[in-house]
Design a protein with these regions (language model features):
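Residue-level signal for the "D+5" position in two-component response regulator receiver
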Residues: 59, 86-87
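Acidic, metal-coordinating helix/loop segments flanking the phosphotransfer/catalytic sites
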Residues: 59-77
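Active-site residues of response regulator receiver
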Residues: 81, 85
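A Lys-centered signature of the CheY-like receiver
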Residues: 136-138
Length: 158
């Protein structure tokens, strides 16, 4: 798969990664996913899908809360809604990158969540914002898990 090729509900932007990654880090600790989205059914479904697959999931409702959580606990993957009122996912991603907020894997991998992310947002916009992967929501559970696994796999080979 080419680095800029869109397939299904996922949009890899940083190059090909192994198709599957283990749910546990080398240390044996479950991978931690920080989900940033306003409360609602999409957030609940996303959390249930990730927890059902064995991930440790933390939920926050805003960009500022996400920054505080990343500084306090870190994360292996950051899944953020791109369109939030207080601080957009675009702005959150830029701040995370600019501040160099490190996770247990070196830096959080951002996933933009939006119902129109693949049809209304260009790959160039995602790349400029340094978003690693994009999925539509609510999205297919298998596509969501595949995206998170690719993000973790990319972190292992980057």
């Amino acid at each position: 798969m080419s680095p800029r090729e869109m397939t299904g509900h996922t949009c890899p932007l940083r190059g090909a990664a192994p198709a599957r990654a283990p749910l546990r880090r080398a240390s044996g600790r479950r991978a931690r996913v920080l989900v940033v989205d306003h409360p609602g059914s999409a957030r609940s479904v996303l959390a249930a899908v990730l927890r059902g697959a064995g991930y440790h999931v933390a939920l926050v409702a805003s960009g500022p809360a996400a920054l505080a959580e990343l500084e306090r606990q870190g994360a292996d993957v950051l899944l953020t809604d791109l369109y939030m009122p207080e601080m957009s996912g675009w702005d959150l991603t830029r701040l995370v990158r600019a501040r160099g907020i490190a996770s247990t894997r070196g830096r959080p991998l951002c996933v933009g969540l939006s119902s129109a992310v693949l049809s209304g947002v260009s790959r160039a916009q995602l790349a400029r914002a340094q978003v690693d992967f994009a999925i539509t929501k609510p999205g297919d559970p298998e596509a969501i898990l595949e995206t998170v696994e690719r993000a973790l796999a990319w972190a292992e080979v980057a």
